[in-house]
Amino acid sequence: MKNIHSIEFYTGSKEELLPGFEKDFPYIASRAELDKYIGHYVPWHWHKTVELFYMESGSIEYDTPGGKLLFPAGSGGIVNSNVLHMTKAISQKEKNIQLLHIFDVSLLAGEQGSRIEQKYIAPIITAPQIEVIPLFPGNAEEERILKLLAASFRLSSDEFGYEIKLRETLRNMAHAF
């Protein structure tokens, strides 16, 4: 997992450039140290990929065209594909650290046009009203997903079978939606 302190854009665009994102495994894991970003925020941006995140510590605010959501430590969520969003660190008492899985839906769905994509993935990623799906402790089903999410960041990329284990974990979480 790579520690990140800034965001990069494609030239002339608000589309985020995702360093290390490869076609043969369309996924990156990041540990965003939001207190180290200029102004303690990530400016407006978007990406074709899905963003699945967990708040390790602190709290952040997600802004989208549809509104604002606050995510304290222990919560998480999904930012849908192609959603314009920004985040800002809120906590001033502890570090604001966000763990992120950023991936192309093909990682879960397989080949474009597959039955899995059509039946389970496309209805979510093509729904413009779904910008962010929040996950908070206190709801049994959401807590189950949050535990899987937190555990998914402890998988070691050096371990044999990492890619298979990670994809299976992401699929298990996606199935819960």
Identify what each model region corresponds to:
Residues 2-10, 17-24, 83-151:
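A hydrophobic/aromatic-rich effector-binding and dimerization subdomain
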Residues 40-46, 63, 88-90, 111-113, ...:
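Short histidine-centered beta-strand/loop micro-motifs
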Residues 51-54, 117, 144, 148, ...:
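Amphipathic, well-ordered alpha-helical segments in soluble domains
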Residues 57, 126, 154-157:
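Residues at helix-coil transition
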Residues 1-63, 67-75, 83, 118, ...:
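Generic protein-terminus/edge-of-domain signal
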Residues 131-143, 155-177:
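Short, Lys/Arg-enriched, Trp-marked, Pro/Gly-tolerant hinge/linker segments that flank
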